[in-house]
Amino acid sequence: MCKSAIYVVNTAAQSVAVGGTIALGSAIRRFGCAVNLNGNSVLLDEAGYYTVDVSIVAAPTTAGTVTATLFNNGVAVPGATASAAVSTAGNPVNLSFESMVRVGCNGNTGVLNVVLTGTASTVTNIAEVVTKI
């Protein structure tokens, strides 16, 4: 049984530049005290392991490959990335990935962000679930 969880969603269209952080919107569901939404970040406030599930709809502004990557404390989480290639600008693509991150002991915290790379895009949906296990 998990101690804490948060479900954040942003369905407002947002223009995200290459290297930009995707705005997470608002918390739809939350329980416990180990995970919190702070602006465009999910904060992990207790030591332990957390699962992270991310789903994104993005429409690249130019043809190319759009990539979304999870960052923890400013560092890309290995394997927590999804990419899709489009041949026509404006075609929406679905990106999703799952990951697990760890917050160490001794007062450490985690700060999770989702960063867009590859090609600038209009993001019309992002949903993120973070669960302390």
Located regions from the model:
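Extracellular jelly-roll beta-sandwich "head" domains, especially the C-terminal globular C1q domain
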Residues: 1-133
